[in-house]
């Protein structure tokens, strides 16, 4: 083992890991791995980016499953002996289990999943969005890049970003530029796909450290959340001017953001039981208090009828807020209070979201008229290890999702898309 550990510390495995460990924040240690051959290697190869509890609480895999999962993060092809010992340790101590199995609900809708595996290992591909030409853009947060897929050919291209940008999301403007949030360097950036030129817009306040989720309004103004900074931002692309406003509630942690039909912004609070309505010109904030203590909201979406749908991540529910009447109604997610609903999208009156606390991550369909749920396990290559952190519809009514742990971008096509019920 001493020889193997020395090989890890000085050799190819460390070289494979270096770009990602250097850019990822070191997680706080938690839990302890069982003793056995390969423990030191797992500690070195895995816990540079992941908390130990992520391994301890995993759904477990066969030897082949662990090999596939680790291959999405580090390249061990030049070190087969070390690769074998790594996967053997993980398979021995963390075999398949059903500790976090979702409660899958049957129904009449069928869905097809189409997957793309992004090129750079360990990038945590996320937040895919469709461009006007049908291409798909994504953020490779941990590898400091954004990428493009041509769904017709499968060809992919990745664009390196300025140092330590660590993009949290991507959005597109009407001119075809790709905008990203620099979550670790306090910037918003714009990529011109035709030239490859990147323009950075730095936050005017040093306290504004982490641009998070972004959305354009109908006037072409970019609005964005800053979760840990507890702020909302507005950027005028024509002038580069940025205005910031602090949330009314301390540690509200603004997360998801959407625009309603009247041009108002709506923000989800990931640290408090609230939704926030924002005036686009004044940035005046109006809080909507949600009734259940312990409620936290990762994301929200707005239906065509103006209803605000949100995930109650902290309580394992989805909810609906009527802005005209103030009525709030919530439904428990099928897998229960620990299911942690995360991303959400409303398409043709149907609510789609995921249960990120389960393994496999479950894609859930909810019909507000019948109040019935249906759900599916989300594929992630040959394993079920990822979670969706954001979902957005295509122009045809499909869903674009991802599995960040395995670098998968996925397009979901419901069979009865044309007749939604």
Residue spans for each PLM region:
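The canonical Cys-X-X-Cys-His
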Residues: 42-52, 86, 90
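C-terminal capping alpha-helices of c-type cytochrome domains
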Residues: 75-102, 134, 397-399
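A short helix->beta-strand "capping" segment at the edge of beta-propeller domains
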Residues: 104-122
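Short loop/turn segments that connect beta-strands within beta-propeller blades
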Residues: 150-154, 192-196, 236-240, 279-283, ...
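Blade-level signature of beta-propeller repeat domains, shared across WD40, Kelch, NHL, RCC1
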Residues: 385-421
